[in-house]
Amino acid sequence: MKTIKYLTLFLVTFLVITGLNAQFSKNPLESYSLVKISINSNEDIIRLQMNDITVEHYRGNLKSGIELVINQAEISRLANTGLSYEIKIKDLDSYYQNRSKASQTEMQKSINILNQDNISGFSYGSMGGYFTYDEMIQKLDSMRIMYPNLISVKQNLGFSNEGREIWAVRISDNPGINESETEAPIYFDALHHAREPQAMACLMYYMYWLLDNYGTDPEATYLVNNRQIYFVPIANPDGYEYNNFTNPEGGGMWRKNRKNNGTCFGVDLNRNYNYGWGVNSGSSNDPCSETYRGLSAGSEPETQAIKTFVQTIHPKISFSMHSVAGRYLNPYGYNDTAVNYDIYSEFSSDFAASNNYYYGTVIEMLSYYSSGTTRDYLHSTGTYSWTPEVGGSDFWPLQSEIIPVANENLYGLKYLSWVGGAYTDYVNYNIAGNGFVNANDTLNLQITLKNKGLSMTSKNVTAEVTSLYSNATPLNSSVNFDSIQARQFKNNSGNFLKFKLSSAAAYMDEMKFVVSVKQEGVETSRDTIRINVGKPIVIFSDNGLNGISKWTRAGTGLLWDTTFIDPFYGSKNFADSRFGNSKNSSNNTFTLSDTINLINTNNPRIEFSAKWAEETNFDYTRIQVSTNFGSTWTSLPGRHTTLISGTPSYTSIKRWVSEQINLNSYIGQKIRIRFNLVTDNGVPGDGFYFNNFKVVNYKDEGTSVVLTNLNVPAEYKLYQNYPNPFNPVTHLEFGIPVMQGESELVSLKVYDLLGKEIAVLVNEKLSPGNYIYEFDGSKIPSGTYIYKLESGNFSAVRKMILLK
C-alpha cells in the first residue's frame, strides 16, 4: 500500500515537473547570442528582416556594423543572407551570469542622481537590479499606502494568456475621480517586450519623481494637480515572468508573450495591434519568429486589455516605452509615411535635445518596418504617440546604468505630461520702436510666447525678464499675458518690458537678459537672450514669407524650401527637409542669390534663429562665405558651432537658438553666403531649420545720421558735402519735408563713378527735418564719388572728392 502511495506521489511530482519543464524549458529558439553584422546599406537591414531575423533595437550603424541579439535558428538563417558576421557573445545566459558587478564609484553616481532628482522611493529590484512582476506590484501598493491622495488603487485591465493581471494606476490630485474634462489624460506603458526592463525602470522612476516631489517641487505639483497620468508598467507579465524563471538574476532574452502556438510559444504583442497589422515586412506569420504577429489583429488578451483601456481614457499623448536603441520613433512604422509631422517634429526637437536621441519614423531611424504596433494604433485613435527606445548598453543594462538611463529620459516624460494639456513656452523677441538701443536709451522689449499644449488654455501666464547687463536698469521687468489658447501665439505688444541704459553702455556691448515664463505661478520656460548695443543697419533680410525667391538650391538629396513646421510667429522656416527627415548621402547647398556688400561697414554680422537634429559628428550643416563669387567657400564659426575635422559645423541636436556670426574679417569686400548640408549613410536626422535671416551692420551712432533741427524744409534738400575735397571724414546734409505720413523711408548711398555701390549710409524711416551724416572714407581709395538721396519719388545726386 505504501509502495503504491509513494509511486503515485512520484508520478504526480514527475507530471508537475514535466509540465513546468514544458512551460519553462529552453530550446534552441531560446538560446541567444550577440552577433555583429557588416552591412553596406539600409537595404541589407530589410534583407535581414525578410529572412525573419529580428533586427529590432540593434546597436551600431552602417559605418561600424550593427549588433543584434538573435537565437540559434536566426543565426542559421543569417548564413543564407550572404552578409559577413561575427558572433561576439555566443551564450548570453552565461555572459549575464558572469559579468562584473558595478563599482562603488558607479553606484555613487546613481545615488547622486537620486539626490539631485529628490527621489527617495525608487530602489533596485532583485532581477539584476530590476523589479520582478511581483516586486512591481508591491511597489504600486506601497505607493498607494505612502501617497493615497496622489495615486489610485491599482486597476486590473485584464488577464494575460496565463492568467496574470495587467495593472494600471493613475497619478493625479484626485486619483479616484475621472477629471479628464478639466485635466488632460496622459498615457505611458512599458514592457510589451519582456526583455526590455529598463523601459519599466524609466516609468517607475518618473512615478516616484512625481510622488516624492509633490508639494515641494512646483513642476511636479502642477503636473499632479492638472493632469491625469496613467501608467501600465508591465504590459506583458507572462513573458516577463518567464524571464524571471529562466534568469532570476536578469538577462532573460524572451521577448513575446507566452501564447502556446502548438509548435512554438509567443506572440509579439507589439505586432498584434489592429492598425497596420500584417502589412509589409514589419512582422512575421511564423509562430516561431520573434516578431510573430498572431493569428489575427488584436488576438491576444494583453493587447485587448490595453486597447480597451486607452479607448476608455482617451489620452491626448503617450509614450509606449521600449529599449535599447536610443531613439524616438514616431508613426508610422509599417510604411514610409510620416504623419502629422508638424507636431511630431516640434515636440521631438524639444525633448530629444535633452538626451540626444534622434527621432523620426522607424524606417528613417532603424531602416526596417514594424507593423501592428502600439504606437501606430494609438495614433490611429487620435493619440499622439511615440516609441522611445531608451538607451543603455544592452537589453539588460548593468545595475549601475538603471538610474542614469532613467534620469536621461525624465525630461521627455515630463515634457509629454506638459504638452498634453497647457504648456507655455518662450518663442522669440523684438525690440519695439526703432528696433535698436543705444546708451541713455530705453529698451522696449516685446516677446512672443506660445501655448504648445494640445489641449487646455494656459492661464495666468506671466513673463519676467532679468538683466545680466550692469548698465541696464529695469523700469518694467514683468508682464501679464493672462491666458493663451492651445497651440496659439501671443505677445506683449503695447505693454513692453522696459530697461533704461546708462551712459556707460558702450557701442557693441552684448547685453544678456534671462526670460522666465510662468503659468499659474510655475515656471515653464527659461531662456537667455542677447542684444547688442548699437544700431543694426539691415543689409539683407528674409523671413521666409515670400518663399525661396532670394535663394538658389543645388546638390544631392532633398532640396531646401520653406516649411510650416514649428515656425516663429509671423514667419516661415527655411529647412533642408520640409516634411520629414533629411536623406542619407546628401550634399546640398542653399545659396543667397544676392551679393552682400560689406564695403564701408564696421561691425557686420549674420543673424538668424535655428534648430537642428543631425547625427553627431557625421551629419552637419555649415554656413559659408565666398569672396570670389563662389569659386571657394570658407565655413564660419558662430555661437553654436562645434568643430568637425577642424571646421565649424552645426551637428547633434539643438532646439531653437539665436545665432550671430561675426563678419569683421570681410569688411570692405563683397561676399556670397550659403548653407551647406552634408549627411552620410547612417541615421538621417530631422535636419536644419532657420528663420529671420539677416545680414546687418552695427554702427556707432556717433557717426550716423543726426537730426540737426526741426525747421522742416518745404521740399527735399540734398546739400553739398563739407569739407570737399575731404580726408577722410566729410559731412552730408539733407532735408526731409512733411509728406502724407509722419515719417518717410529715406535712402542715402555712395557710389563710385562706374555706378558700383560703395556704402549704404541711411536706409530707414525718418521724420521731417534736417539731417547730417558724418561719412568716414578711410576704408576706400582716393577718387571722385557720388552720393544719392532717395525718398518716395524724389531722387538727387551730388559729387564729392576724397584726397588722401
What does each model-identified segment do?
Residues 618, 679-698:
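Extracellular carbohydrate recognition
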Residues 227, 244-432, 474:
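Metallocarboxypeptidase
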Residues 473-505:
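Intrinsically disordered, low-complexity Pro/Gly/Ser/Thr-rich segments with frequent PxxP/GP/PP motifs
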Residues 598-607, 612, 704-722, 726-750, ...:
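Glycine-centered coil/turn sites that cap beta-strands in beta-rich domains
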Residues 1, 487, 623, 673, ...:
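Terminal processing/anchoring signals of secreted or surface-associated proteins
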Residues 424-439, 536-547, 696-721, 737-742:
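Residue-level detector of functionally pivotal "anchor" positions at catalytic/ligand-binding pockets or at interdomain
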Residues 539-588, 635-657:
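Extracellular glycan-recognition surfaces and repeat-rich motifs
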Residues 762-797:
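Short, surface-exposed loop/turn motifs with a glycine/proline- and acidic-biased composition
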